[in-house]
């Protein structure tokens, strides 16, 4: 990984832990250039990408597909049910096969944390791996689009007060963002049910009472309640959660006029956030979705630059 002539070069993108501040800022600025129509890009040769999603996805899956098409890549969509995965083939052997067929980039989402390690450490797999989310582990492209959205608003990260609220322990978005936001100089707070908080967050910020910190916040980043990762016997009340931990209309009145509201989506309206606030003037949720395409264009360009530099 490196930055040369203002352009980031990546071999793979699996975790925010692997990115430097210079690389992050380079990707943000390149994504902004794509968004403004000021980025020149042309493929030197035919390039193939395959999107392997083993968990449901709308935003990540389709924005990667659109980003790939905008860059001129040939896209091979992958249906696990129609593939040899349904016959018992492993993910490793599937990627080994795609690599042998000539696929250059595999974008993968899996419910298995760290699935990518055996792929990037293999001597026989040469295609680039982009992590589209691994269980409750990491979601680097979501983190980068979140950072782009924050940077568009404030032009900095240093000193910003940011709360990440909700289903923390099950959230790959929280874990990706907390690592990089702290490195970039933001001051982090975590809010939500105590049962969904763990000591791993202590090194990055402070567990806080939402009502006490709301008036100080620059960014309120909400997280989806991830029922699919909870124990089946865990009790949950939508109304109770919204009342005690959600961004209600009354709580939103406590925010500074300059504060912004974020959510990686999908949004559970009237659970994490009041329905009326999702598309409110302070919300940047739709902007996050749009920025996802440009951020992923920047990621893919960096991957291609890294392959070319080998």
From Swiss-Prot:
Class of enzymatic activity (EC top level): transferase
Known pathway: Pyrimidine metabolism; UMP biosynthesis via de novo pathway; (S)-dihydroorotate from bicarbonate: step 2/3
GO biological process entries: 'de novo' pyrimidine nucleobase biosynthetic process; 'de novo' UMP biosynthetic process; amino acid metabolic process
Disulfide bond sites: none
GO cellular component: cytosol
Enzyme Commission code: 2.1.3.2
Catalytic activity from the UniProt record: carbamoyl phosphate + L-aspartate = N-carbamoyl-L-aspartate + phosphate + H(+)
MF (Gene Ontology): amino acid binding; aspartate carbamoyltransferase activity
Annotated carbamoyl phosphate binding sites: 59-60, 109, 139, 142, 265-266
Protein keywords: Pyrimidine biosynthesis, Transferase
UniProt-listed Pfam families: OTCace (PF00185), OTCace_N (PF02729)
Binding site for L-aspartate: 87, 172, 224
Quaternary structure, from the entry: Heterododecamer (2C3:3R2) of six catalytic PyrB chains organized as two trimers (C3), and six regulatory PyrI chains organized as three dimers (R2).
Family to which the UniProt record says this protein belongs: Belongs to the aspartate/ornithine carbamoyltransferase superfamily. ATCase family.
PANTHER family: ASPARTATE CARBAMOYLTRANSFERASE, ORNITHINE CARBAMOYLTRANSFERASE, MITOCHONDRIAL
Annotated function: Catalyzes the condensation of carbamoyl phosphate and aspartate to form carbamoyl aspartate and inorganic phosphate, the committed step in the de novo pyrimidine nucleotide biosynthesis pathway.
Name assigned to this protein: Aspartate carbamoyltransferase catalytic subunit
Record organism: Lactococcus lactis subsp. cremoris (strain MG1363)
Gene designation: pyrB
């Amino acid at each position: 990984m490196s930055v040369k002539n203002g352009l980031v070069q990546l071999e793979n993108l699996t975790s925010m832990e692997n990115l430097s501040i210079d690389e992050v800022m380079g990707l943000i600025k390149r994504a902004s250039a794509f968004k403004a129509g000021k980025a020149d890009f042309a493929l030197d040769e035919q390039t193939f990408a395959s999107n392997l999603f083993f968990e449901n996805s709308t935003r990540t899956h389709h924005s990667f597909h659109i980003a790939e098409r905008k860059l001129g890549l040939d896209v091979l969509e992958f249906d696990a049910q129609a593939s040899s995965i349904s016959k018992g083939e492993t993910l490793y052997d599937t990627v080994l096969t795609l690599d042998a067929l000539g696929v250059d980039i595999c974008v993968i989402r899996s419910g298995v944390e760290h699935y990518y390690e055996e792929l990037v450490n293999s001597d026989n797999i040469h295609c680039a791996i982009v992590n589209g989310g691994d269980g409750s582990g990491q979601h680097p492209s979501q983190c980068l689009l979140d950072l782009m959205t924050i940077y568009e608003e404030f032009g900095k990260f240093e000193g910003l007060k940011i709360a990440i609220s909700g289903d923390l322990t099950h959230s790959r978005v929280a874990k990706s963002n907390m690592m990089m936001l702290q490195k970039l100089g933001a001051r982090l707070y975590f809010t939500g049910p105590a049962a969904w908080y763990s000591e791993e967050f202590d090194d990055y910020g402070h567990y806080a009472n939402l009502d006490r910190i709301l008036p100080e916040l620059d960014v309120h980043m909400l997280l989806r309640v991830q029922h699919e990762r909870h124990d089946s016997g865990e009790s949950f009340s939508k109304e109770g959660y919204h009342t005690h931990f959600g961004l209600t209309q009354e709580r939103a009145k406590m925010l500074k006029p300059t504060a912004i509201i974020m959510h990686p989506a999908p949004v559970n309206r009237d659970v994490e956030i009041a329905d009326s606030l999702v598309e409110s003037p302070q919300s940047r949720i739709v902007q996050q979705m749009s920025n996802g395409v440009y951020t992923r264009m920047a990621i893919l360009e960096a991957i291609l630059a890294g392959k070319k530099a080998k």
